[in-house]
């Protein structure tokens, strides 16, 4: 005779998100001890999460709050649309802001209610049956502007931008956030670009020009022109503004009296 009731099964399912048979089996194994059954399902969930570790997490969302920006990944857009997944993401980004967590490790260790962010993600992963990954996190402690972009109306934001700046023109800072979202700047200034990357661009530009049969005396000018083009692609302040392509982002910021001190751009599934 079973030493548990249908109400026990229902309660266990509601608490853990486990299926009916898994809940029944846990209660049988626990000999009706409800707390032990919960523990058994947690252990089973942890094992399942481990098995999921090799599966890809190419979906998910970005979230921002009070200077914090996070990317939380799932395996499918079905989970990304899930209200509980989105609610947990909002709790995590709030925890990131409260803890001033500047990286994933710091955020995983941050408190969230009676547990940690890391355990909260593991519990949700076990409940919904997908691998979840806190992929990126950062926090800026200055004056910030944020922008979140949706790829589709029925999906949560997939691109998030955080801009730290000085100055009073919030609209200019917002325009820069839109710029970063659209044109994917990687660096703030030319000085931020690693020297080996610039050297490689110069080498490629020179070899390409030679292969095209350009005259030797023109190579220096051609190479410099192509490196300048590279800077305009990857350096925020060098980029033509999306609002006025006759001016650089730096020129428009100077006019607005705004200085960008740093920025971050997260896009779901992208490096």
From Swiss-Prot:
Pfam families: EF_TS (PF00889). Gene3D superfamilies: 1.10.286.20, DNA helicase RuvA subunit, C-terminal domain (1.10.8.10), Elongation factor Ts, dimerisation domain (3.30.479.20). Keywords: Cytoplasm, Elongation factor, Protein biosynthesis. PROSITE patterns: EF_TS_1 (PS01126), EF_TS_2 (PS01127). Its main location: cytoplasm. Residues 76-79 are annotated as: Involved in Mg(2+) ion dislocation from EF-Tu. GO terms for molecular function: translation elongation factor activity. GO terms for cellular component: cytoplasm. It is found in: Cytoplasm. Belongs to the EF-Ts family. HAMAP family: EF_Ts (MF_00050). Associates with the EF-Tu.GDP complex and induces the exchange of GDP to GTP. It remains bound to the aminoacyl-tRNA.EF-Tu.GTP complex up to the GTP hydrolysis stage on the ribosome. This is Elongation factor Ts. It comes from Mycolicibacterium gilvum (strain PYR-GCK) (Mycobacterium gilvum (strain PYR-GCK)). The gene is tsf.
């Amino acid at each position: 005779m079973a030493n548990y009731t249908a109400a026990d099964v229902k309660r266990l399912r509601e608490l853990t998100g486990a299926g009916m048979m898994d809940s029944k089996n846990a209660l049988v194994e626990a000999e009706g001890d409800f707390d032990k059954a919960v523990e058994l399902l947690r252990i089973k969930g942890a094992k399942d999460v481990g098995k999921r570790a090799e599966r890809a997490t190419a979906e998910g969302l970005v979230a921002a709050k009070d200077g914090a920006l996070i990317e939380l990944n799932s395996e499918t857009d079905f989970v990304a649309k899930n209200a509980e997944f989105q609610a947990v993401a909002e709790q995590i980004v709030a925890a990131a802001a409260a803890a001033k967590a500047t990286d994933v490790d710091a955020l995983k260790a941050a408190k969230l209610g009676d547990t940690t962010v890391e355990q909260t993600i593991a519990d949700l992963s076990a409940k919904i049956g997908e691998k979840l990954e806190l992929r990126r996190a950062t926090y800026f402690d200055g004056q910030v502007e944020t922008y979140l972009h949706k790829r589709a109306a029925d999906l949560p934001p997939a691109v998030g931008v955080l801009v730290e700046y000085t100055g009073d023109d919030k609209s200019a800072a917002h325009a820069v956030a839109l710029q970063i979202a659209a044109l994917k700047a990687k660096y703030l200034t030319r000085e931020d670009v690693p020297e080996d990357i610039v050297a490689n661009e110069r080498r490629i530009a020179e070899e390409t020009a030679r292969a095209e049969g350009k005259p030797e005396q023109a190579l220096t000018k051609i190479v410099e022109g192509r490196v300048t083009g590279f800077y305009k692609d990857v350096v925020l302040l060098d980029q033509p503004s999306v609002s006025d392509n006759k001016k650089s982002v730096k020129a428009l910021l100077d006019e607005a009296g705004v200085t960008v001190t740093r920025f971050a751009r997260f896009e779901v599934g992208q490096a």
